[in-house]
């Protein structure tokens, strides 16, 4: 998930760098959503238009939406849409769960205690 502040153009400009870094370290099939945050602000405060955000997302193959955490608008959707896209990739065989790396959750996923008796999870 890449999030920028629609009232601060610098945060939008940084999205290209952040995306490049994420793709360099992640799976090529990675699902990314671009979220323009603070959509509750007035149009006069806006520094990045919705069309600009959508064009960037289209150009880079990203999902897109604008949200307002303050108004709780589209916040859930920012998480649900990528999850649905990942589910679709798994369902149609584009990716297989065994091919993915990342955080493992479930039995046996906790780190073992080191010699000092400390463990991390």
Residue ranges of predicted features:
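Conserved Switch II/interswitch segment of TRAFAC-class P-loop GTPases
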Residues: 1-16, 26-30, 39-47
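Generic structural signal for well-ordered alpha-helices
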Residues: 19-20
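Conserved P-loop small GTPase signature centered on TRAFAC-class small GTPases
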Residues: 28-121
């Amino acid at each position: 998930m890449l999030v920028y502040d629609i009232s601060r153009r610098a945060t939008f400009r940084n999205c290209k760098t952040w995306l490049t870094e994420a793709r360099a370290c992640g799976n090529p099939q990675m699902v990314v959503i671009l979220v323009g945050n603070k959509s509750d602000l007035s149009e006069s405060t806006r520094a990045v238009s919705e069309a600009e955000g959508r064009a960037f997302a289209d150009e880079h193959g990203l999902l897109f939406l604008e949200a307002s955490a303050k108004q709780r608008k589209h916040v859930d959707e920012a998480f649900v849409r990528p999850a649905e896209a990942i589910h679709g990739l798994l369902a149609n065989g584009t990716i297989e769960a065994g091919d993915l790396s990342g955080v493992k959750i479930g039995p046996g996923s906790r780190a073992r205690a080191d010699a000092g008796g400390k463990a991390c999870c």
